[in-house]
């Protein structure tokens, strides 16, 4: 039985280190993005939906490509990098509110939402006019949030 106890202790140490790594990563991401508020959660959902609907649209058009898919993922990653940069500008340079971060998040919410609607149209799904209007309005008004 002593061998088993030694293995359990090693495994517990590994688990502890993994927990610390995830806690550190979560802390960094929370700091970098300015916390995970409703806007950021919505952006995550919109980005995932846009990628998924884009893959569906490409499959229907028989245009699936791993290269195009990789570029799409790279663009999605850059969206979140820009949100983080906007948050750093707000918190470290302007030191006043979250106007830049919010404007960047709204900009990409509108872009990703409109892209989902375009993908839905390619798939053959009718798109509600009110939804199109709301996303277009959000895209137009994104910069009005910035009061520097």
Q: Model-predicted segments: where are they?
A:
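Hydrophobic alpha-helical transmembrane segments and immediately flanking/interface helices
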Residues: 92-122
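Juxtamembrane/interfacial segments flanking transmembrane helices
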Residues: 56, 115-134
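Alpha-helical transmembrane segments of multi-pass membrane proteins
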Residues: 43-54, 79-87, 107-115
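Conserved small/polar residues in nucleotide/adenosyl-binding loops
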Residues: 146-148
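Alpha-helical phosphate/pyrophosphate-handling elements in metalloenzyme active cores
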Residues: 16-34
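Helix-coil boundary and interhelical linker segments in multi-pass alpha-helical membrane proteins
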Residues: 29-40, 90-100
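Short, Lys/Arg-enriched N-terminal segments with co-localized hydrophobic residues
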Residues: 1-10
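Juxtamembrane helix-capping/reentrant segments at transmembrane boundaries
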Residues: 61-82
